[in-house]
Amino acid sequence: MAQCNLFYQYPITPILEGHVRNILICTEKDVEKLQSQSSLRLREKIDQGHRDKLLRMRLKTELDALQKKMQKDSDVLNSHLKAIEDALLFTNDGEVNVETKADAQLIPKSPEKLEKFNQVAITPLDPFIRFTDDFRGEMINTFFNNAQMWNFTFGSWFYKLKRVFYNEPGLRRALKLTNVDSLTISKELLAVTVNALEQATVYPIFGSEMSDLEAALCILAAFYSTYENSQIDERTTLVDVITLLPVIFRLLGSEITALKNVSPSGTYFGFNDPSCMKFFVPMRKGKHYAENTFGNHVLIKMLLGRGVMQKIPGEKISQNFDVEARLHGAIKNDVLVYWTYQLMRPKLGNNVPIFIHDQHYLRSGLVAIESLFLLWRILNSESLFNKRVGKFLLTSIFPQLENVDFAENNFEAGNIQNFEYLMHHYVVPMYNLQNDISISTLFPGLVAVCVNESVRLGWEHKCAGAPSDAVQVQSKENPFVEYIRAQMEQQADVAILEKHDCILFHLENGLNITLSFTLPRQRLFAMASSLFNVNDTYDFIYFLVLGFLPIPAVI
């Protein structure tokens, strides 16, 4: 068997055997490093995927816009080609003389030169008004182009502005002011003043993702959704909410009346700002106002009571919701967040702000609700078919119109819908034209009346807590004078912003004062009549929309 040993044994004896520690060793530090590198690469891939998705979405949007533009240009070109072909058919010799005026009109124009017209209606008594881009600016131009044969007055408030600026040589030349004794004002002064009225609720510093009107519509939609059989669902748009405003305001009025019966302060529409507050922008992290700023606001109490809002950070009014969160582990779904996302998602995508965190949206939305609610209470209080006592006629701006008297003596209307008509034929077209439009841009006349109501009482932040039985002297001049002067003199941006926010604070206080009255119409009409030539509902509606009311002056 010795010869067979090699069959069972290795022919070569191994010299070096494998060591017991001759293995791959990976420490915990190495494992963590590998995990970190893998996580980093995975994060980079995820971020790259998000970037690619955003780029694809942006590319799709640009391609869709380009496709629509090309389709529009193609339709325009086809229409012009058809017009040229029709002209060629009627030509005897088969040639077209492009130098003639008639044929020159058939030459296709570039899409940039094609005019796009929009139209709105203010009252059911008057025809639609067509304009191109700037409704109010074009109305001012039309008025001054057609008013050369007459002298017009715009009220004592505009005349006082003229007297103030007339005494300053630089502003007098810039605004082209002459003849200080005349009640008429220049086109430049009217345009600058109306622009200041339009910009009252437009915040000029940071780019807001939504306007105050959109914020108000989101809040009202969330409020309306808490009622049974409400005409609102996931397919509802902001335009639909505008058409539902009369129904919503009836419910809102009932809720406010109920709160008024429970508490004497149930009609307080103001904010508890700190003394000497100068700027509208929140000072706490740029998002939150001071503690308990919204504590006494009647709309906040109503929204919390209806379950529309669950909590406002740092507010004493919402401490009971903290208890609920601790007991049940979570707070109920926020109705306001849900409807804000539903209504604003088509415009903003997933970047929809949350009002309880970005509180400037909440505050501006509440002010817009107050403005619309005040209009609803006033405009439907009197029919336009009653016998008129006002002197404004649309022929003052459009002389080609005929004066038609629709008034009836002893007219009784069972269903007045002045507010509904204005929303449907004015607010909706203006919002479709410019979806970031604000309340002051829609109704500059309302800004003028409410601000002057606050200024007349001498209100300021530092005296906001003064006793109600004491009268307050006015320590400052007209805030619009300071704002216009700051703009014309090109003062520092901070100075202009401070004067702009002063107007906004006066607007908030003026709305609070007016809405606290049982009959706000008499209060506003008394102010508008003494300052802006307003004498009836027809005059008031046009003043709300235009921001001025020209009346022929007898020299």
Curated annotation (Swiss-Prot):
Family classification: Belongs to the herpesviridae CVC2 protein family.
Signal peptide: none
HAMAP family in the cross-refs: HSV_CVC2 (MF_04025)
Function: Capsid vertex-specific component that plays a role during viral DNA encapsidation, assuring correct genome cleavage and presumably stabilizing capsids that contain full-length viral genomes. Participates in the interaction between the capsid and the tegument through interaction with the large tegument protein/LTP.
One GO location term (cellular component): host cell
Subunit text: Heterodimerizes with CVC1. Interacts with major capsid protein/MCP and triplex capsid protein 1/TRX1 at the pentamer vertices. Interacts with the large tegument protein/LTP.
Membrane-crossing segments per the record: none
GO biological process, one term: viral penetration into host nucleus
Subcellular compartments: Virion; Host nucleus
Protein name: Capsid vertex component 2
Organism whose genome encodes this protein: Human herpesvirus 6A (strain Uganda-1102)
UniProt region (Interaction with major capsid protein/MCP), positions on chain: 1-47
NAD is among the record's keywords: no
